[in-house]
């Protein structure tokens, strides 16, 4: 699999730490992502037979290669014309996962949720564009079951967003909750509040 973003790029001097050292990045270290734990890339790295991370920033690039979490190569480049951002390539370790295949329908659902939860995010998967103009409101409207009794009530704060509505004909209570961009079907403290 290969993932490319066109953001600022992981700071190249911290690239190895960002993809391989637990407790680096995320909470407290980067004010622009205060709610993440920063374990995702590290987990993918350690569960991959091959893992490559490339960061391009300010005309410089760094590419690090790992096998099962062990660094095998570290390449630094200057004078790069490529746009800023990060590229992650990996192959899931078949010794851990056996033969596997990606379930596009699950990725489709996940990516639709992500662009709604992370307003402004745009994702392309196999030439299909994912984008949400209204964030969580789009997610709610796309998943309404029955006729709404009233327009959704939408509350938004610095670190929280809540939408509430009720529908005719629905015999059970349905709560969709997310924390740190992750769907939490079994709830948690945020859902009990």
Where in this protein do the model-derived segments appear?
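Short, polar/flexible loop-turn hinges at active-site or ligand-entry regions and domain interfaces
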Residues: 28-31, 94-102, 185
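Short beta-strands and strand-coil junctions in structured, solvent-facing domains, enriched
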Residues: 9, 95-98, 118
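GHKL (Bergerat-fold) ATPase N-terminal catalytic module, capturing the glycine-rich phosphate-binding loop
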Residues: 1-92
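Residues forming anionic-ligand binding surfaces in small-molecule and nucleic-acid pockets
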Residues: 83-93, 171-180
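Short, exposed beta-strand "edge-strand" segments with a Pro/Gly-rich flavor and a Y/T-containing core
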Residues: 7-10, 67, 100, 125-134
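Short, charged, solvent-exposed linker or helix-capping segments at domain edges/interfaces
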Residues: 63, 99-102, 175
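GHKL/Histidine-kinase-like ATPase module
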Residues: 77, 104-105, 112-115, 119-193
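Generic recognition of stable, solvent-exposed alpha-helical segments in well-folded globular domains
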Residues: 13, 17, 39, 46, ...
């Amino acid at each position: 699999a290969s993932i490319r973003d066109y953001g600022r790029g992981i700071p190249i001097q911290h690239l190895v730490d960002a993809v391989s050292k637990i407790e680096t990045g995320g909470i407290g270290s980067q004010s622009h992502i205060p709610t993440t734990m920063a374990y995702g890339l590290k987990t993918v790295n350690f569960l991959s037979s091959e893992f490559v991370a490339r960061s391009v920033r300010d005309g410089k690039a760094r590419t690090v290669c790992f096998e099962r979490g062990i660094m095998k190569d570290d390449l630094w480049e200057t004078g790069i014309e490529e746009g800023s951002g990060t590229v992650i390539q990996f192959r899931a370790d078949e010794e851990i996962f056996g033969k596997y295949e990606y379930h596009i329908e699950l990725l489709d659902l996940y990516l639709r949720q992500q662009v709604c939860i992370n307003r402004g995010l745009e994702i392309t998967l196999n030439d299909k564009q994912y984008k949400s103009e209204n964030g969580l409101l789009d997610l709610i409207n796309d998943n309404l079951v029955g006729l709404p009794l009233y327009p959704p009530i939408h509350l938004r704060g610095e670190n929280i967003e809540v939408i509430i509505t009720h529908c005719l004909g629905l015999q059970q209570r349905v709560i969709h909750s997310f924390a740190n961009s992750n769907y939490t079907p079994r709830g948690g403290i945020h859902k009990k509040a």
